Amino acid sequence: MKLVVGLGNPGKKYEHTRHNIGFDIIDRCAQKLDLPLDKQKFKAIYGEKRIGSEKVVLLKPLTYMNLSGEAVRPFMDYFNISNDELVVIYDDLDLPVGKIRLRKKGSAGGHNGIKSLIAHLGTEDFNRIRVGIGRPAHGEPVVHYVLDTYRKEELAFMNEAAEKSAKAIEAWLEKPFLEVMNTFN
């Protein structure tokens, strides 16, 4: 089984904000794979489907970002999913707008959703796709920046990043994550 988690905040208020790029990419994957998110368990909505010989689960936590681990860990335990069968997709202030970076492990880098996952999983060793949202303009508070929607000039870059991330997930269904990293980084 392969589990793909997109991080974000629940509710209309946060739809299509920078911090919710993980949710947006899960939605894109669901559309590409014809895999509706029609189930709910452990503070998350998800969908599952067998693709070839692999069962794939797409998941969006219903907790707020900084509590993401509370939704993901029970789900992984219940379905007996290992850390190398997990990919987490999330926004990254330290990457330029629209740039993606795949990693097999790493620190939270100040991201509260990843901090929560590390705390609940007990390790930094899990696959991730970091999606660049850039940094706020001088003086703009980070919290306002990440919870805001994209500027018009950012939309094409973010759409491209979402598409590339979805393609990386599709590739991971057939290849080891390290191979996918080498292709998409």
From Swiss-Prot:
The role this protein plays is: Hydrolyzes ribosome-free peptidyl-tRNAs (with 1 or more amino acids incorporated), which drop off the ribosome during protein synthesis, or as a result of ribosome stalling.
Extract the SUPFAM superfamilies matched here. Answer: Peptidyl-tRNA hydrolase-like (SSF53178)
What biological-process terms (Gene Ontology) are attached? protein quality control for misfolded or incompletely synthesized proteins; rescue of stalled ribosome
Task: List the Pfam families.
Answer: Pept_tRNA_hydro (PF01195)
Feature type site, description Discriminates between blocked and unblocked aminoacyl-tRNA: 9
Q: What class of enzyme is it?
A: hydrolase
- Tell me the lineage of the source organism: Bacteria, Bacillati, Bacillota, Bacilli, Bacillales
Checking PROSITE patterns in the record gives: PEPT_TRNA_HYDROL_1, PEPT_TRNA_HYDROL_2
Q: What is this protein called?
A: Peptidyl-tRNA hydrolase
Give the catalytic activity. an N-acyl-L-alpha-aminoacyl-tRNA + H2O = an N-acyl-L-amino acid + a tRNA + H(+)
Give the family this protein belongs to, as stated in its UniProt record: Belongs to the PTH family.
